[in-house]
């Protein structure tokens, strides 16, 4: 569907004709009569048009049967999609409306009104929502006053729809009649509950003309959803003053204020976990617009004093965050007034709290003799937050919450004993650098960095009631009051061995001390080196390498995984040949956080640039970062955790759960060739590759057979790559005509590849680990559970392509007038397995292996439980047009509503005619 056109093309033609009479006075004045240029302004008209075609399923509106293979349309998408280029990803962070615009203005006016003062004005993309202004007034060498204003939009999606309406800032209501009917269906018997998917999606008996389609509200809830474009607008203003009191002393100050206002998507769960069902007592969830309305304020006052051999500076910085919406309330679409533990009628979310931060900055530098220089900075900080707590819950069915003082109070009231957090943190950043030149061509640098993050927030007792499943157990926030201290010591030597050539070698140590984290202390040692050679003018060569090894003293699970028998913490570092015991609660004892666990890092970068002749320049670069977390010991297991080992192993040995490898590399090449003084060509190519490998374990309560067995370990890898091609040409004719054109393609792919590592059958030891419903006739210690909906299977590939063609023509009509014409074409092709199949309702599906079991929702799920490969039933009715084997929906989403957030593909044309006026 094409966006609506206007008469802007005619405006472009008229604008071009108005430029023609200027040739009558195109002669330039003699050079001696030319005044100095004070600035320039570029203004004109533009027009953009195109198609948003990336969601053909939405363009057709809802399917009348719920099966896109039997009737065109999508499942649960609401009314037909109305594509507008202005709300698409094409204008995600900009405002390119058609018509008149001012691209930029830059002007400096000295000796204002015969005085010694000056004024400077600058703008970028003036007038519309994507704009920037800077004004400066001052006296050279004496003082300067600046005013700056910036504005930028952010459009999140143009495919969203909802029936939520905002009745007050941050308060969202859902139509009463629909809530009542959904509650009635969920409160009925199993047959009544089974009609919820059809009622939501408008299929089966609830399809137009169906037996239950008595009115609009009965013919599919999501089919009545209204379009809603979540977006925010950011506005920021700055005032700064700088004054040189003496040639050596400068005083300065700044005030910055930023506001953000609008809406963005957020998900709410009206339950204690994401699991849900059709019953009124089961959980439910909904995506709603998050109301954004807050200010950031920054104040800075400081001064600098400097002499020839030393200098000092100091400043005070204050940061203040003010949120105009301190909480958000949303009605539960699936529960009108059936108040019960575990089934709330409203959801409550605490928004970002108001907070303040204060910093003092001190810095100085001095020469310690002729060959030594010392630089230092000390920056203490104080962070405060004391926002009032919200009530434990809005659910009146929960009573008797502990308030931290041993008594009981209503759960719908805020904590009585501790009404607010009294959040208190203190930071200290110190940097010391000593540089010396012991010999003519040698430089030695020693640096010490110290950072303290002390969380002094008092420990309070609370009674969490997340999900309103029951009256919670009193607990405290002690484990969340994390603190850390980081110290770095670096020694570096530089040798300038030849003209424009140097070599560097060094060592760095980093000590980390943490509180209320899994690792209390760790040490990372690094060695590095680099070489930079430009001795021969045509050749430039740069290379660097860094090796780092981080080791924790001891890995203690802060979540406290406990033994099923003794209740003691389960260690991961058991003796060789001993299997870690099963656990009852907390994390798997060998799970590791990547920012704390042992790691080996290798990093290398290189650059070569060669100019064999004046007309030709060739360049190439490459870089790689490899993080290896799969270390034996050092807080990890001393023996492989694989269930299958030796010749039967399905993967290499692993000693932890979590990320094992994180690898990224890039390379590229470029060439610039001057065909003549007027024409030059350029071409560039770059490739980026990212790869992460992790291993996890599927867990169920240990009361179930095989609940904690390495036979249910699974592996996931996430290869991603991006390729960028660019070719173009620059043409300059007689210093009058400038023509630039280029084509660029950015292509990216992302995959998530998963597989199980155990065995569904008889293992090499002769034990029957096969999956059987009810756990009959199989071994509890190795029962295979990765079947059906929990099978480890590959996700569909996500793909992104961005083509852009540009041509810019510029002509020097006179010394002051430069007409410019610009054309751009952009095509964005995109599909993401997380968003492209997304609609407002994803619960209209039939059960595993039983197409049609839900009336009007004949969408097949994964095949029955005896499958361990994660295969889908074939054919797949109701699949996404982007992913023929990808099922749109899940039976567990029967009581979930979504906004349908996506950013569809588009192609857009852009033309503009502008005039640069230099004055």
What does each model-found stretch correspond to?
Residues 45-51, 123-129, 139-141, 149-155, ...:
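Transmembrane beta-strands of outer-membrane beta-barrel pores
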Residues 60-85, 159-221, 264-287, 324-351, ...:
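Solvent-exposed loop segments that connect transmembrane elements
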Residues 48, 93, 858-860, 866-871, ...:
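Outer-membrane beta-barrel "beta-signal"
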Residues 24-113:
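Outer-membrane beta-barrel initiation region
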Residues 42-46, 120-124, 136, 146-150, ...:
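Transmembrane beta-strands of outer-membrane beta-barrel proteins
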Residues 39, 101-105, 131-133, 143, ...:
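Hydrophobic, lipid-facing positions within transmembrane beta-strands of outer-membrane proteins
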Residues 94-102, 125-127, 229-233, 291-295, ...:
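Short sequence motifs at beta-strands and strand-loop junctions characteristic
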């Amino acid at each position: 569907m094409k966006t609506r056109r206007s008469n802007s093309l005619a405006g472009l033609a008229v604008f071009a004709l108005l430029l023609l009479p200027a040739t009558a006075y195109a002669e330039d004045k003699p050079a001696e009569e030319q005044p100095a240029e004070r600035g320039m302004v570029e203004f004109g008209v533009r027009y953009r048009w195109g198609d948003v075609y990336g969601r053909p399923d939405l363009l057709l509106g809802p399917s009348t049967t719920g099966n896109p293979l039997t009737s065109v349309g999508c499942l649960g998408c609401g009314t037909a999609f109305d594509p507008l280029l202005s709300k698409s990803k094409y204008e995600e962070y900009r405002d390119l409306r058609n018509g008149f615009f001012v691209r930029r203005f830059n002007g400096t006016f000295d000796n204002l009104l015969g005085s010694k003062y000056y004024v400077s004005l600058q703008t970028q993309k003036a007038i519309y929502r994507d704009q920037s202004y800077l004004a400066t007034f001052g006296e050279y060498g004496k003082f300067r006053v600046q005013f700056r204003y910036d504005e930028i939009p952010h459009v999140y999606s143009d495919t969203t729809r909802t029936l939520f309406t905002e009745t007050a800032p941050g308060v969202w209501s859902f139509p009463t009649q629909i809530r009542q009917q959904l509650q009635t269906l969920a409160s009925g018997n199993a047959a009544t509950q089974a009609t919820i998917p059809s009622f939501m999606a408008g299929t089966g008996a609830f399809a137009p003309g169906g037996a239950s389609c008595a009115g609009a509200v009965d013919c599919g809830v999501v089919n009545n959803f209204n379009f809603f474009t979540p977006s925010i607008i950011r506005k920021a203003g700055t005032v700064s003053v700088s004054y040189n009191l003496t040639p050596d002393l400068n005083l300065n100050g700044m005030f910055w204020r930023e506001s953000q206002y609008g809406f963005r998507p957020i998900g709410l769960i009206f339950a204690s976990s994401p699991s849900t069902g059709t019953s009124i007592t089961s959980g439910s969830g909904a995506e709603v617009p998050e109301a954004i309305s807050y200010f950031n304020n920054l104040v800075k006052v400081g001064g600098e004093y400097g002499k020839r051999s030393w200098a000092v500076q100091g400043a005070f910085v204050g940061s203040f965050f003010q949120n105009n919406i301190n909480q958000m309330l949303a009605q539960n679409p699936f529960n009108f007034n059936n108040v019960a533990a575990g089934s709330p009628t409203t959801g409550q979310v605490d928004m970002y709290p108001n907070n303040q931060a204060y910093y003092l900055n001190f810095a100085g530098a001095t020469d310690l003799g002729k060959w030594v220089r010392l630089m230092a900075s000390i920056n203490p900080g104080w962070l405060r937050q004391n926002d009032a707590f919200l009530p434990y819950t809005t659910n009146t069915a929960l009573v008797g919450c502990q308030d931290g003082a041993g008594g009981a109070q209503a759960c719908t009231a805020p904590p009585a004993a501790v009404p607010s957090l009294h959040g208190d943190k203190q930071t200290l950043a110190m940097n010391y650098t000593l540089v010396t030149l012991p010999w003519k061509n040698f430089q030695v640098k020693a640096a010490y960095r110290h950072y303290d993050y002390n969380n002094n927030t008092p420990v309070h007792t609370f009674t969490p009631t997340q999900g309103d499943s029951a009256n919670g157990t009193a607990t405290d926030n002690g484990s969340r009051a994390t603190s850390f201290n980081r110290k770095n010591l670096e020694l570096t030597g530089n040798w300038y061995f030849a003209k424009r050539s140097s070599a560097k070698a060094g060592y760095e140590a980093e000590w980390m001390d943490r509180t209320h984290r899994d690792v209390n202390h760790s040490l990372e040692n690094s060695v590095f080196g680099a070489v930079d050679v430009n001795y021969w003018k045509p050749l430039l060569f740069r290379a660097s390498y860094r090796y780092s090894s981080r080791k924790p003293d001891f890995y203690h699970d802060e979540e406290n995984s406990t033994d099923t028998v003794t209740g003691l913490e389960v260690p991961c570092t058991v003796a060789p040949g001993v299997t870690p015991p099963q656990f009852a609660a907390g994390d798997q004892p060998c799970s590791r956080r990547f920012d704390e666990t042992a790691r080996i890092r290798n990093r290398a970068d290189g650059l070569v640039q060669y100019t064999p002749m004046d007309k030709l320049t060739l360049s190439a670069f490459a870089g790689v970062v490899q993080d290896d977390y799969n270390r034996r010991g050092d807080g990890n297991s001393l023996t492989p955790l694989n269930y299958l080992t030796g010749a039967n192993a399905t993967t290499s040995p692993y000693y932890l759960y979590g990320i094992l490898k994180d690898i990224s590399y890039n390379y590229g090449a470029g060439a610039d060739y001057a065909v003549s003084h007027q024409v030059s060509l350029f071409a560039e190519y770059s490739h980026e590759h990212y790869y992460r490998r992790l291993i996890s374990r599927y867990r169920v309560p240990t009361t179930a057979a095989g609940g904690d067995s390495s036979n249910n370990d699974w592996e996931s890898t996430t290869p991603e790559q991006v390729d960028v091609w660019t070719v173009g040409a620059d043409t300059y004719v007689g210093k009058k005509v400038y023509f630039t054109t280029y084509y660029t393609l950015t292509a990216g792919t992302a995959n998530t590849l998963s597989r199980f590592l155990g065995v569904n059958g008889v293992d090499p030891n002769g034990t029957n680990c096969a999956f059987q419903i009810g756990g009959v006739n199989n071994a509890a210690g190795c029962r295979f559970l990765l079947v059906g909906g929990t099978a480890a299977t590959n996700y569909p590939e996500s793909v992104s392509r961005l083509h852009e063609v540009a041509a810019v023509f510029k002509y020097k009509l006179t010394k002051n007038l430069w007409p410019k014409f610009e054309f751009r074409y952009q095509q964005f092709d995109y599909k993401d397995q997380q968003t492209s199949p997304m609609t407002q309702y994803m619960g209209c599906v039939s059960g595993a292996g039983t197409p049609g079991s839900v009336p009007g929702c004949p969408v097949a799920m994964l095949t029955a439980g005896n499958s361990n490969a994660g295969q889908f039933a074939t054919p797949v009715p109701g699949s996404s047009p982007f992913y023929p084997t990808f099922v749109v929906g899940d039976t567990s989403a029967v009581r979930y509503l979504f906004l349908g957030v996506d950013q569809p593909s588009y192609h857009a044309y852009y033309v503009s005619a502008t005039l640069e006026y230099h004055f």
